[in-house]
Structure formats: structure tokens, C-alpha cells
Amino acid sequence: MGFFIWQKFWDATRVDVVVTGIEDQAQLTLEEASDLHVEIDIEQLDLEAGVTPTLFFDGVELDDESHEISETGITWDPEPLEEGVHVLAMSIGRPLLDDAKFTWTFAVDGTPPVIDVVSPQPAVPICTPVTVSGQIEKGLASFQIDGEDAEVDEDGGFTLEFDQAPLGPILLTAEDQAGNRAAAEIVIPVEYPSTQGIHVTAAAWGYDPLREHVLEMVDAGKVSAVQLDIKDEGGIVGYDTDVDLAHEIGAVRQEYVLEEAIDLLKSKGVRVIGRIVAFRDGPLARWASENDRMDWVIQDNEGGVLSKYGGFTNVANADVREYNIDLAEEAIDRGVDEILWDYVRRPEGDIEQMVFPGLQVPDDSPEAEKRAVNDNVVSFLAESGRMVRDRCVYQGASLFGIAARNPDAIGQPVPDIARNVDYIAPMLYPSHWVRGEYRVDHPNAQPYDIVEASLSDFQRKAAGSGVAFNLWVQDFSIGIPYGPEEVRAQIEAAADLGVENWLLWNATVRYTPDAITPEMVKRPDGSLRPGS
């Protein structure tokens, strides 16, 4: 009988608790803690019999307004909680027995994990192994590098090893036990060799007087590099290429033998830059329109080829991309030291008058379409850059002067492009600016001032990327005669900003050697060239 009485007494006073909304030792983010809802179900709760609960938070008894007690348990909806460790406790009074006590300890953590790594990393020689070390907090739920789980030592240290510096940013992501996430990018730039060069068209190299003019500048130590056109603004490939599509579309015009030109220039100690005009390509656009390949071109709103520049090809089209990358790969195989992309953009003008077949746009707004074009330009450079980097060659991109201020107008977002090329070649020709631009009264008459103002803007936009700069310099006259003083002023403005790399531009390949002084031309290692 005594056992029976005791069993009945125990059943009447035993407390079974089920909690939802919080767990002991839980880790909550600030967001989770701001919307916390806790229910404590107490199966044997009998308020009339004296089985009554009292709730405490961080050692303080909660008032009746902060929670609700019913016949089935307690509901607690606290105000947003601060970061730190908290304790929720409950005491239930029982007749003739000590109170039943329960506690739930949990932490509110709204601070994302810290990823401590230097970016950009110091520039390293191209095609050499590189190691990057960093530190993260211990005890993370996950740590990934470019989407793959990464190893971390017991002190939170990590090490990344590469056969060579990868082109483009490396993405690090971390998540702590509370679910807070953090991300960081690592950019590893490569050392870009000192470059002072001139633009040379295929036709100019094939024309004896102009070729001799170029070689005289080389022999006089006026340049350390020569830029040769691989594919020009007219879409013409100026040598006998092995890329079949170039022949099929009628783009080949053999002005020179590429290998012979490269061998001659390298024998004289200068580097060779292969320039490829990417998406401004009349021959490819015409061929595409005549052969039911309209997805290869930018269209007007009536479905025809956009007439600007004689036809602009579509950066979102895989075949167009492949054609350009095939030409770049061939130029590298034949010996160029760099690939310099030009017209790696969309045409300027109202994007609502342009149709990009296959372009993935999240909504129908012009802003979304501009961003999608920007993303495709960047992804093209990332795609080509992987091929170029694998061959231990540099990749550059010529950018319109307005790209720093209005990238969406042409599809050239400077910060993103800077992370996917080895150098930017901004085209800041003084004659191309309107009066008052960058607060320069008469840019064409003030070459130093406009280059200093616009180039510094490019540098600000590219900050954090480690990208090098290689300035296009105006060596031609529009409106105001340009001679040695005007050409030199642009070079000096860049040098005063720490940019000593430059390329002279003259569409007719008739340059001003007297503009170049000995201290302006250096070997790739930065030392002065003999004869300069």
C-alpha cells in the first residue's frame, strides 16, 4: 500500500518538460535572437495544486508581461537579445518537494568570423609557384576556398599553394557555429614588365617605309615593346592564320608573316604585344547575318544587325568568344608576349536600342541589361585569361576613357575587369574629352592635366586589385597640333602617378621619336635600355 501511495504522489509531482524554439548550448545569430519564440510545454502542470512555474533570464525573475503561463506551459517572446551567453531558467514549485529546476544556456553571436589575409598579395613573377597564408578564428562550422572545403590547423591558420598565380579573385567563405557568414577575396597580381611601346598595324608592318620607321625607334632605344595587330578594328586578320573561321568569313588579308615579325623584334630585345579587337568585327557580323547566325551579333529592335561600326558581335555568344580566343591562342603559340584586348565592350549608345541574343537578364529593366553585359565582358576576360595565364603570357584590356565614370555606358566595369587582367590600358587621349571634363578647362590643350585627372580616377576605381597600368598616349593631332611637348606631357603625368608603362597611338603609325627621352624607356626589369 505504501508503494502505491508513493507512486501516486510521484506521478502527481513529476515534471516532464518539452521545449521548442531554443536548445541547450544553442548558437543564435542576431537575426534569430531578434525573433525568438520559446514554448515550454509542461505535461503535469497543475496551477491549482501548486505546481507553478517561475521563469528567470540571466538570473533575473521575469515579470508577468514578458511571458504567458497557461495550463499547458509557458510562452516567452523576449525583446531582441544582445550578443553574449545567456541563461534561461525555470523553477516549478511542487508540494512537499524541492522545486524542479531547468536551465538552457545559449549564445547570441552576431559577429561574422574574421578572415585575416592580405589582398592584393604582393606581385609575383608570372608562372612561378606562390604560397598564401592567412588566419581565421578557430571552431568554425565551415571554411571553403572557391567552394571547396579547406583545411585549417588547430590555431586557425591556413595555407594556399598554387603552381602559379591564378588569374582573377580567389573567394574565401567562412561560417561560424551561430551561422554568421563572412567572405573575402584574395587577388594575386603578377609582376608586369616595364613597357614602353608603339602601336603598329598589320598594313604598316607590311609597308617597308613604316616598318623601317618602327625599327629605327627600336634601334634607337625609344621603345621596349612593339604592339602588332592580330585582328584590327575592321575585323581583318593581317597574317595567314590557321583559324579556319577567319578564312571562312573573308577576314584574312596577309600583310605580314607573324612569326618573322616576332622573331625580328625579339632579336632586337623588345617584347611583342598582340592586339586583338574583340567584338567590333564587321566581317564576322556580315558573315553571321548571311549564314543564319544572327545570335552572333548585336541586333537592333527590328532584328537586323546593329549598324554601328559596321556590325558589333555579341559578347554573350560562345562562338564569338571562341573565335577571338582561338586567335589569341594562336598568337601566343607563334610567340607574342602579351595579348591586349581592344573593343572588349558593347557599343556606346542607348542599350534599349540593342538586342543581345542569349543574354541572361534577371528582369526587363535597362539597368539589369547593362549589368548583364558588364558581367559578360568580365566573364569573357576571365575565360580568355585562364588560357593566357596557362601559357605564361600577360593579358591586358584597353578601356575607354569614360569607363571610370560611366562603365555601364559601354560595358566596362573597371573594378571587375581589373581583377581579371594583368594590366589595364586606358585610352585617355586629350582630344577625346569635352571641355570641363574632370574640371580641366581645355583637355586637348592641357594634356598633362587631363591625363593626371583621368588616370588617377582609373587608379581609384581599380584600387585593391593589384592591376598594372599601361597608358595609351596620343601621338596624333586633332584640333591642336601635337608634337614632342604634348606627347611627353602625357607620359610625365602618368609617371607622376607611378605609371611608367605607355603605348603611343597613331593610326597611321607615324610617331614622334623626339618626344621620348632616355629616362622614359627601360628594360623589363626597370633598368635603362642601352642607347636610350
Q: Residue ranges of each PLM-predicted region?
A:
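Glycine-rich, aromatic-flanked loop segments that form ligand/cofactor-binding clefts
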Residues: 225-227, 257-305, 338-342
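Aromatic-lined carbohydrate-recognition surfaces of secreted/lumenal glycan-active proteins
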Residues: 271-281, 340-343, 371-410, 465-477
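Catalytic domains of carbohydrate-active enzymes, especially glycoside hydrolases
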Residues: 211-236, 334-338, 497-500
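Flexible, low-complexity linkers/stalks enriched in Thr/Pro that connect modular domains
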Residues: 8-20, 102-116, 186-193
